[in-house]
Amino acid sequence: MMNQAEEAKLLEQLEQWNKKDEYSRCIRAIEAIPEQERGYLLTVKLSRAYSNLAVLGDHGEHGTDGEVDGDLIRHAIELLESVRAQGENDPYWNARMGYSCLMAYRSAASAYEYAKHWLALVPDDPAAQKLVRDCEEYLEEEKALELD
């Protein structure tokens, strides 16, 4: 079992790797810990790493090609689902779920629900405000396409 100091050190290291776009390293480090010992926060961080790897790739190798690895992004969502009970009223969980749903399903409807809940939890968060606006724009575009 990891103690609090070890977990804090790992979380700090994960943030460094995340900033350097080293998502695979984050995944390997977290998955080296037995699943039943990971807890809520490490599970959410693991989901973030899978989501970022799916969309961006290590060191931005996907760049802006718009290619998303469907298996990885669905795994990211499964990880978030596994801690839904603890996450439902956590702004960060809703943020990760909103972004992941938007990338996985190319549909803003499910992402919009998480984005709105995130914004309700932290109304002043500019990132939450932006995700809500982005989802609203996507939903308008989807509606316009249906009308064509």
Predicted regions and their residues:
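Amphipathic alpha-helical repeat scaffolds of TPR domains
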Residues: 2-15, 36-62, 88-103, 126-141
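Residues in the short coil linking paired helices within alpha-helical repeat scaffolds
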Residues: 22, 72, 106-107, 141
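Residue register within tetratricopeptide repeats
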Residues: 24, 74, 108-109, 126
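Solenoid-repeat scaffolds in large eukaryotic assemblies
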Residues: 26, 59, 111, 128, ...
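Primarily a tetratricopeptide repeat
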Residues: 28, 71-74, 78, 113, ...
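Canonical positions in the second alpha-helix
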Residues: 32-33, 82-83, 117-118
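Short amphipathic alpha-helical heptad-repeat segments
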Residues: 43-46, 108-112
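Short coil/linker segments at helix-helix boundaries
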Residues: 51-82, 102-103, 110-111
